[in-house]
């Protein structure tokens, strides 16, 4: 059956609209499935089987709601979160936000660098992992200084397509459909340290605080780069929400299938504790055979190279906006020296964590747990800003946004308090 010219035009228009709408939200969603996320979800599947599948249905609306608030703040104020707080709130709140964000982001950078080093060693065993970590750190720093981030992201996001392999693998394996439906729609909760650690790590690596800053700043820069002053209306808000929802859906879809894949392949193979990247890569063996290591390595390297600039960039934006310095990944080095020096410092600090003796796998999970413990404070700040009419004008939260925001705050705070309680008592 041939397609009529009018139909072709309609399809082209829809595709153009689709590509136009996809922006910061899609990059945010893709970078959320970073090495820390991949390993955390893999650990959840290996340790608990399918018991945490239901968390994807919980985190998608919560993650989308928080990221939408951050994006709306950036659109309306033309500033990132730190810049908005600096203009409208007290400095102690700004410093509190920096205090909660800095260690978690640096640890995440270090864990991702270690993860990239480990998979590099997986491909070339003759070279120690630290060699790859150093090489990738230098490569990233050079790329971020000399190339606009959007060019880097547009190239690297194709490597992240490898993650879609996780969606295929479960269909090559004999599945208990009843168990999948049960664990997807009926929450399983156990009040023990191991379960709560995994739950906090899943929440922390999915609803990651660094993405709050990134989303707001990227939307603000989109506004600043326009030749004409942007009038934020319903159409602009609707397109922004489309972008956010698509990006967050992709992120949570991949996370769901990573748990399903590892909860089937690794858990049923009695691999319940992932200590090495080789073990994590085993989940792809049913589809890829001996190429499983290559696919896993490409996925981790691609997501790591996509996410680390987002992490270090987020930290640089926070510090630059806190102290009123000029900054931005669209600027050249001589235009924003302090901004790029902070990025370099964060990479060096992250790399130095490789020398303290924590295994890359554990570091990736620890980073996710730390995010889970610090996120409630930052969600509270985002909620306050997005409900402040002096800041947001007529674009404050509706009741749905507030309901989802408060639910995210309560769920993450409860999981974090439960984990601390178990650890202490």
Task: Tell me what each language-model feature is.
Residues 72, 76, 94-125, 133-137, ...:
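Hydrophobic transmembrane alpha-helices that form the core helical bundles
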Residues 161-188, 204-219, 381-390, 415-425:
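Hydrophobic alpha-helical segments and their helix-loop junctions in multi-pass secondary transporters
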Residues 2-5, 40-43, 68-93, 118-120, ...:
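Flexible loop linkers connecting adjacent transmembrane helices
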Residues 135, 144-174, 370, 375, ...:
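Membrane-interface loop-to-helix entry segments
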Residues 62-76, 217-225, 249-279:
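Extracellular/periplasmic helix-exit of transmembrane alpha-helices
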Residues 91, 130-135, 246, 250, ...:
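Loop-to-transmembrane helix boundary motifs in multi-pass membrane proteins
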């Amino acid at each position: 059956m041939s397609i009529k010219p009018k139909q072709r035009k309609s399809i082209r228009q829809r595709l153009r609209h689709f590509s136009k709408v996809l922006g910061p939200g899609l990059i945010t969603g893709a970078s959320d499935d970073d090495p820390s996320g991949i390993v955390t979800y893999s650990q959840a599947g290996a340790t608990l089987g399918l018991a945490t599948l239901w968390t994807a249905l919980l985190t998608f609306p919560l993650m989308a709601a928080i990221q939408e608030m951050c994006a709306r703040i950036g659109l309306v104020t033309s500033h990132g979160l730190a810049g908005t707080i600096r203009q409208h709130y007290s400095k102690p709140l700004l410093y509190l936000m920096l205090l909660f964000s800095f260690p978690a982001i640096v640890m995440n950078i270090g864990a991702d660098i270690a993860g990239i080093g480990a998979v590099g060693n997986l491909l070339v065993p003759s070279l120690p992992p630290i060699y790859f970590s150093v090489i990738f750190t230098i490569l990233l720093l050079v790329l971020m200084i000399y190339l606009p981030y959007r060019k880097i992201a547009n190239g690297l996001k194709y490597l992240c397509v490898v993650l879609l392999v996780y969606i295929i693998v479960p269909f090559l394996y004999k599945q208990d459909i009843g168990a999948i439906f049960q664990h997807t729609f009926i929450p399983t909760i156990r009040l023990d340290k191991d379960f709560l650690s995994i739950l906090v790590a899943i929440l922390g690596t999915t609803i990651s605080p660094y993405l709050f800053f990134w989303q707001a700043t990227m939307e603000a820069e989109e506004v600043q780069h326009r030749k004409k002053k942007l009038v934020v209306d319903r159409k602009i808000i609707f397109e922004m929400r489309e972008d956010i929802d698509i990006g967050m859906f992709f992120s949570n879809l991949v996370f769901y299938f990573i748990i399903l894949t590892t909860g089937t392949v690794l858990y049923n193979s009695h691999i319940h504790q992932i200590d090495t990247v080789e073990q994590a890569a085993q989940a792809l063996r049913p589809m890829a055979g001996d190429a499983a290591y290559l696919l896993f390595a490409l996925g981790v390297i691609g997501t790591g190279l996509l996410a680390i600039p987002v992490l270090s960039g987020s930290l640089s934006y926070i510090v630059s906006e806190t102290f009123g310095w000029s900054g931005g990944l669209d600027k050249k080095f001589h235009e924003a020296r302090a901004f790029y020096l902070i990025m370099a410092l964060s990479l060096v600090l992250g790399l130095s964590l490789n020398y303290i003796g924590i295994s890359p796998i554990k570091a990736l999970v620890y980073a996710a747990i730390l995010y889970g413990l610090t996120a409630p404070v930052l969600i509270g700040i985002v909620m306050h800003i997005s409900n402040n009419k002096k800041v947001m004008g007529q674009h404050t939260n509706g009741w749905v946004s507030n309901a989802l925001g408060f639910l995210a705050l309560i769920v993450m705070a409860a999981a974090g308090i439960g984990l601390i309680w178990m650890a202490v008592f």
